[in-house]
Amino acid sequence: GDVYKRQIVVHGGGPRIKRELDKSNIQSKFIRGLRVTDEKIINIVESVLIDFNNDIVSSLDKKNTEAVSIHTKKDNIIEVVPEAKELGFVGLPNKINNDILLDIIRQNKIPIISPLGLDKNNQTHNINGDTAAMAVAKSVKSRRLLLMTNVDGVLNKEKKLIDEISSSEILEMVKDETITEGMIPKINACLDAVNNGVTAAGIINGTKQHSCLWEIFSDKGSGLSLIHISEPTRPLSI
């Protein structure tokens, strides 16, 4: 079906990175939810994410779905600037090469993108997965940005799923702490996307089978919080 042919996947890799760093007895320090990344860590992060990327592509191949790897060692499309000095090699996407992406999509293949980028000196940087996905969605003006997580979207005070929410309602929920720290980076990625040409952005439970298909084909979605823009909104501060 056509629905598969225009998808772009940006993957993460936190648990695999943690396993590999543990093996080398490297303790990670986090600032604002981002891993402080020195030279030793960035080398491990890059190799783990590239291996994971190749695993995803080969499992899709086995399902007769043609996918193409994109990462810092092959067709890098993300140019970054350093996010903050104290974070080391953590990058903020500055520019996305749409041509490579659109070329892959035109061949009816799915781009599988690692959350890595290169700065102007070709130094590899680690990128927060949600930030990378949002930057790509904005750049190609996607119809939909879906951020997959292991929880059911955004929950209200009664812990019930909110299926549609506007940007102004989000700000209220952050003020009264209904939306907590862990969800804020995802919400920010969604807000940034819908402020910049993406029709709607959602946070979805990726551990539920077929959750993406439900979201694309059904009116009700499946454990999804969909964020529509009500007016331009500044990012939330943590």
Where on the chain are the PLM-derived regions?
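Single conserved hydrophobic/aromatic residue that forms the stacking wall/gate
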Residues: 1-4, 227-238
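Glycine-rich phosphate/pyrophosphate-binding loops
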Residues: 68-71, 77-78, 140-154, 203-204
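Ligand-binding beta-strand-loop-alpha-helix segment within the catalytic cores
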Residues: 22-112
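Alpha-helix C-terminal capping segments
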Residues: 2, 23, 135-143, 192-197
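Conserved, well-ordered active-site substructure
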Residues: 162-165, 214-226
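Structural motif
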Residues: 8, 110-114, 146-148
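Short, ordered loop/turn segments at secondary-structure junctions
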Residues: 12-15, 22, 33-35, 72-75, ...
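Polyanion-binding loop/helix "lid" in catalytic or ligand-binding cores
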Residues: 38-65, 114-120, 124-136, 162-212
